[in-house]
Curated annotation (Swiss-Prot):
Reactions catalysed, as given in the entry: Hydrolysis of DNA containing ring-opened 7-methylguanine residues, releasing 2,6-diamino-4-hydroxy-5-(N-methyl)formamidopyrimidine; 2'-deoxyribonucleotide-(2'-deoxyribose 5'-phosphate)-2'-deoxyribonucleotide-DNA = a 3'-end 2'-deoxyribonucleotide-(2,3-dehydro-2,3-deoxyribose 5'-phosphate)-DNA + a 5'-end 5'-phospho-2'-deoxyribonucleoside-DNA + H(+)
CDD domains per the UniProt record, alphabetical: EcFpg-like_N
Name of the protein in question: Formamidopyrimidine-DNA glycosylase
Encoding gene per record: mutM
Source species, domain of life: Bacteria
MF GO annotations: 8-oxo-7,8-dihydroguanine DNA N-glycosylase activity; class I DNA-(apurinic or apyrimidinic site) endonuclease activity; damaged DNA binding; zinc ion binding
Active site: P2, E3, K58, R261
Annotated zinc fingers (FPG-type), start-end: 237-271
């Protein structure tokens, strides 16, 4: 599933092509995604002008002058591309939003786990209203994590992946951040010290910022809007490397399932 760096990469690739463009039309080839595509998308987008493209957590928000925004989630395997308007659709190209410059914003989603919704006020939408802070914002600190974790018995990796705690940190970047901070993913969240949470918050920020710089992580499905892969995969220290040697100490990396998610860590480097 695309995580925050992949969605941010998508945003940065799309925004220059979309902001200020008037929408000419919308084609829905298959509206029955995990969340059915909102009927307002067909009704209100044609004739509207795109005023901004933003990200909240793993959601892309396409603001318009039609009194609302399109709320888009890439799901497990979705992608967005800006293409010439006469580009033939491929399999799983479910939505086309045609623009005044003759190009088209195309949403492809093979597994149909994504969504394309309409919302007057994005911050009040049920999918967004209860989300935690952005990990790259000043609100996300080690002190914040330490205070919120008090008394929690869940594994710290599960805690870090809770979108009500902090948004956008999924399995890949939680594993990598915990490795950099030297914290075992198995440790109870409430038993991590303030100082170690400060290291963890710094690690999350550093790893996410670098992953964005590298264009995200291409594992199976993610490609950026220009079709390029993400290159952070080459930098992975633990994720997907079970049974291999730790790049820091040479010990064999361990593997377990935590919260129904595969987890890899170094028992020597992470305590």
């Amino acid at each position: 599933m695309p995580e925050l760096p992949e969605v941010e990469t998508t945003l940065r690739g799309l925004a220059p092509h979309l902001v200020g463009q008037r929408i000419h039309g919308v084609i829905l080839r298959r509206p029955d995604l995990r969340w059915p595509i909102a009927e307002q998308i067909e009704q209100l987008l044609p004739g509207a002008t795109i005023t901004d493209v933003r990200r909240r957590a793993k959601y892309l928000l396409i603001d318009t002058d039609a009194g609302g925004s399109a709320v888009l989630h890439l799901g497990m395997s979705g992608s967005l591309r800006v293409l010439p308007g006469d580009t033939p659709p491929r399999a799983h190209d479910h939505v086309d939003i045609s623009l005044q410059n003759g190009r088209v914003l195309r949403f492809n989603d093979p597994r149909r786990f994504g969504c394309l919704l309409w919302q007057r006020d994005c911050e009040t939408h049920e999918l967004l209203a209860s989300l935690g802070p952005e990990p790259l914002s000043p609100a996300f600190t080690g002190d914040y994590l330490h205070a919120l974790a008090r008394g929690r018995r869940a594994a710290v990796k599960t805690f870090l992946m809770d979108q009500a705690v902090v948004v956008g940190v999924g399995n890949i970047y939680a594993a990598e951040s915990l490795h950099r901070a030297g914290i075992s993913p198995l440790r109870e969240a409430g038993k991590v010290s303030r100082e170690r949470y400060r290291r963890l918050a710094d690690a999350v920020k550093e790893i996410l910022a670098y992953a964005i710089q590298r264009g995200g992580t291409t594992l199976r499905d993610f490609i950026s809007p220009d079709g390029a892969p993400g290159y952070f995969e080459q930098e992975l220290m633990v994720y997907g490397r079970e049974g291999q040697a730790c790049k820091h100490c040479g010990r064999e990396l361990k593997h377990a399932t935590i919260g129904q998610r595969a987890t890899v860590w170094c028992a020597a480097c992470q305590r």
